[in-house]
Amino acid sequence: KRLLMKKAVILFNLGGPDKLENVEPFLFNLFNDPAILNLPGFFRFPLAKLIANRRAPTAKKIYQELGGSSPILKLTEEQSHALEIKLNKDDELSDYKCFVVMRCWHPRAENVVKEVINYNPDEIILMPLYPQYSAATSGSSIKEWNHVCLKNNFKVKTSTICCYPTDKNFVEAHKTEIIKKIKNLDNFKLIFSAHGLPEKNIKKGDPYQWQVQQSVEEIVKSLNIKNLDWILSYQSRVGPLKWIGPS
């Protein structure tokens, strides 16, 4: 029997609180990331504590409406399972195993890396589930993963999928979902809502905004609706800095 190449696929996502009492620690992890609050540690730590504490009551109300927790882990695990089945079906020369790593809640990189070491792969593929690249999302997750591998002295051939803002299947999936919702084009506005970023991140060269624009333009093009009324907006602004807009 031929030996299969063992390939570990690491799927990165943000994570979310699994219960209401974890909303504040989740928010702290989010804002204590230097890619989010670009400040020295001794400033960032207390500021992250303060922001998390201030935002927790509002965030808790939102999670309450979602049933008391974030659905992101369950949905990402479903994606991971479906991808693993498809990869093993499509490539008979390799044995694929998918692992989920969350940046701001569990499962964290430091725990998942131990499972990957046990799996003992010949190759690792890093796959952020953010279609558009930003240093604050994909960049931060990849950086943390590399740091954890270094700490565990774990060296394996690794390749990284950066981003896929105009991938045809990604565009097609959006088109399908949008078409399902269009009841009457005469009284219809399509609002694209992407997560915002501070403007200074973009000015420093972060490609996120133009990749979001690329995604939206491709989706609009694929819909092929004459005089479609659409707009791109950005959400979730935090702190005093100027963020990209319109909000």
Model-based region annotation:
Residues M5-S247:
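Active-site-proximal alpha-helix that buttresses catalytic centers in soluble enzyme cores
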